[in-house]
Amino acid sequence: FDHEEVGSDSVGGAGGPVLEHVLERLAVATGADRGQYLAQLAASSCISADNAHSVHPNYPERHEPGHRPMVNRGPAIKLNHNQRYATSATTAALAQRVFEAAGVPWQVFVSRNNMPCGSTIGPITATRLGIDTVDVGVPQLSMHSARELCGTSDPEWLAAAMTTYLGGAW
């Protein structure tokens, strides 16, 4: 999608109709009518995968004490009470099942509600399509800086979890 770093509200951004139209065209091309397409959406789930903020050793106070994702300790399930992430209790449980089925360690990132928080396209996708969505990500240091840093194991673990999710073995 275009314009992800500035809000996604454009024709080519996640807030536009592109994903919705592509999915409907795929459904119609496989013989589904509109009612079947809508039923398929209702029965679907989505993983929004965008990196997560790892606790920075210079700024540990910026994380909730019980929710401090660390590099190379597994992907993080991301939660925000203002819905800046799409994760719900139901979709967090889905992600946990997927991680456990894949044999992948996982962590939880809960953004502090007294500090600003960025967002992902997860809430946009969930809102536009009505699909249960979970936001997950590889913990990284210095997000949006010239020197972002993540571990070597976390991307491999996330790839293994995505393979398990897409294979339906959870």
Tell me the role of every PLM-derived stretch.
Residues 19-22, 67-71, 128-131, 148, ...:
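Short, surface-exposed linear patches
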Residues 8-16, 81, 85, 111, ...:
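Hydrophobic alpha-helical scaffolding
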Residues 24, 28-31, 97-105, 141, ...:
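Generic secondary-structure signature for well-ordered alpha-helical cores
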Residues 14-21, 90-94, 116, 120, ...:
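Generic recognition of stable, solvent-exposed alpha-helical segments in well-folded globular domains
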Residues 1-67, 169-170:
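Acidic/histidine-rich catalytic neighborhood of metal-dependent amide-processing enzymes
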Residues 54-140, 144-145:
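Active-site-adjacent substrate-binding region
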Residues 138-170:
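His/Asp/Glu-rich mid-to-C-terminal helical/loop segments that flank catalytic regions of hydrolases
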